């Protein structure tokens, strides 16, 4: 789906780090190194980015018209 704006646990903003994280990991960089360089140090925030699955393109086909 869409990346949450804030971490569910601590409330820190994580959405602004999604694009750089995603681009760098898709480019072949190590996710641990990327998160550290982006300043995501808490493990609760790290899991928000690591466990996110972008499935909005698949789900949009199953919505009903309003």
Curated annotation (Swiss-Prot):
This is DNA-directed RNA polymerase subunit Rpo10. GO terms for biological process: DNA-templated transcription. Zn(2+) binds at residues 7, 10, 44-45. It comes from Sulfolobus acidocaldarius (strain ATCC 33909 / DSM 639 / JCM 8929 / NBRC 15157 / NCIMB 11770). InterPro entries: RNA_pol_su_RPB10, RNA_pol_suN_Zn-BS, RPABC5/Rpb10. Belongs to the archaeal Rpo10/eukaryotic RPB10 RNA polymerase subunit family. One of its GO terms (cellular component) is DNA-directed RNA polymerase complex. The keyword RNA-binding does not apply. Pfam families: RNA_pol_N. Keywords: Cytoplasm, DNA-directed RNA polymerase, Metal-binding, Nucleotidyltransferase, Transcription, Transferase, Zinc. It is found in: Cytoplasm. It comes from the Archaea.
């Amino acid at each position: 789906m869409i990346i949450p704006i804030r971490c569910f646990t601590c409330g820190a903003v994580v959405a602004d780090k999604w694009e750089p994280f995603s681009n760098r990991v898709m480019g072949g960089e190590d996710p641990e190194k990327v998160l550290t360089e982006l300043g995501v140090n808490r493990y609760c925030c790290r899991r928000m980015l690591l466990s996110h699955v972008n499935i909005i393109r698949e789900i949009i086909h199953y919505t009903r018209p309003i």
